[in-house]
Amino acid sequence: MPIFILPKTDPTRPALRCFITFLMILFFMAIPCITPLAASGDESIFRTALPSTEWRMEGQSYAFLPQNLYEYINGEAEFFIAFGFIELTGANYTSVGGDNDTVTIDIYDMGNKLNAFGVFQSKRGGQISALNVGAASTGSDGYLAFYKNRFFVEIQAYIASEKQKHGVETLAASIAAQLSGDNTPPWELFYLPEKNRITGSERYIKGGILGHAFLDRGMVGDYRIQGQKITAFVAMLPSPRDAVHAVEQHRSFLLKSGEKCLPFDGVGHHGFVSEEPYHQKIIEAQVGAFVAGVYDLSTIEPGKTLLEDIIKTIKQMEPK
């Protein structure tokens, strides 16, 4: 724990001492709020989640933090850290039958449900799965992933014996049952209307929707309307002023790219219609602290209808 040493000062400088004392108070108040997986006692999951006596935990569980995650997953560390990664806790299992079957379970504490959802959707790559584990899950031979609350879980199995292959989903369900929280998706997902939305296409983007830093983070989903497959987004900004600024930055970018920006006053504010490089037509508007848009449009009409629905949904969800 850090030790704060106050510098020697004369009585005429009380403000500095008060400021440092204030920082110390904030630091100690924050300590109880830091409850990653290991600190919360959930690491016992690894010993209690065994689906049968045919598996045993190999040694102790292990843990990695943002500063050393690269030692475990190397190039993927930056991806997880970008989504708010707090801690990884994991364990290895071996078969007691001498079949050399092994299972590795890694539980990523992502800080909140939205971050865990974002990681899961990115990792599953749009695959639809019938697995019923956690809030959502996906799997193939030797691999299963799911998320629940703020946790993203990966299970990798190397199993030769047929009788053990079906035990991976059972093990995953046991892990999920012991993680805190519920199986509901993040509420931000519902900014995207369900009607005509392509199941499994929803994702949480951090680092720039359409590659634009001014649309740093938000929800994105694909829709099929009037025979067109189009994409909608809701960028979440710190304030309405920031949202207006983001729309203006986008408009400026398109104009500098040689595209025309026609005004769109149907819904929202500061709206425009233009051509997004590599993504056909785009329609965009600001509402509150959000920027909503639809792109990959061959014609504008489906985009107008969807944008109206999105902005209506945002207004219903946000407090007046």
What are the functions of these language-model segments?
Residues A145, F152-I155, E284, V291-V294:
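Structural recognition of the beta-strand scaffold that forms the well-ordered cores
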